[in-house]
Amino acid sequence: MASTSDFKNGLVLQIEGQLWTITEFQHVKPGKGPAFVRTKLKNVLSGKVVDKTFNAGVKVDTATVDRRDMTYLYHDGTDYIFMDGDTYDQISISEATVGDGARFMLENMAVQVATHEDVPLFVELPVTVELVVQHTDPGLQGDRSTGGTKPATLETGAEINVPLFINTGDKLKVDSRDGNYLGRVNS
C-alpha cells in the first residue's frame, strides 16, 4: 500500500486487478475543497494511457516489481533477447513489452528489465544513449524553412530531428524516453 504522497514516476499500482505505472503526477491544492493528485497512468500490459485523479492521502495497492540489470543481446523476429549478467540466463521479451525504447537499443547495451511475478513488464533504457548518425542530408547554410533542424537516421534505424550542423558519422547524445537530440559527443 502506498499513499498519494508516495507517488513518483515509475511506481507500479495495482488497480482493479490490472497493473498501471505512473508516468506523470501533480499534487493540486485548490483554493476551495480538499487537495488531490492528478495522474497519468499507463497500463503495463496494453500500453493504454488514462488520466486518473486521487484524493490526497488515499491508500492505493502497489505491485511488487523487481528490476534486474540485464544486457540486450539481439533481436529475433518479434522478440528481443536479454541476458542476466549475474546468472547468464537469457530471456525473450516481446516487441510490445519492450515498447518504443527498442528503436534506441544497441546490442550489448545495459538495460533494466522490470518483472512482476517473473513476468517481464517493461524495459528501461538509460536516459541518454550515444548513437552514430548513419545518414543525414547536408544542412544548407541559411536554410530556416525547417526551423533549423533536419531528419537524421541513427545506427539503430531510428529517425530523429537534429540541428543543421550535424553530419553523417557524428556521434550524438539522444534522450531515450522521447527521442530528442541532446548534443554531440566529443570524440
UniProtKB/Swiss-Prot annotation:
Subcellular location(s) per record: Cytoplasm
Pathway(s) per entry: Protein biosynthesis; polypeptide chain elongation
SMART domains the UniProt entry points to: EFP (SM01185), Elong-fact-P_C (SM00841)
Main localisation: cytoplasm
Entries under SUPFAM superfamilies matching the protein: Nucleic acid-binding proteins, Translation proteins SH3-like domain
Highest rank taxon of the organism: Bacteria
GO CC, one annotated term: cytoplasm
Annotated Gene3D superfamilies: 2.30.30.30, Nucleic acid-binding proteins (2.40.50.140)
Coiled-coil ranges (or none): none
Keyword vocabulary terms for this entry: Cytoplasm, Elongation factor, Protein biosynthesis
MF (Gene Ontology): translation elongation factor activity
A single BP term in Gene Ontology: peptide biosynthetic process
Family: Belongs to the elongation factor P family.
UniProt function note: Involved in peptide bond synthesis. Stimulates efficient translation and peptide-bond synthesis on native or reconstituted 70S ribosomes in vitro. Probably functions indirectly by altering the affinity of the ribosome for aminoacyl-tRNA, thus increasing their reactivity as acceptors for peptidyl transferase.
Protein name listed in UniProt: Elongation factor P
Gene: efp
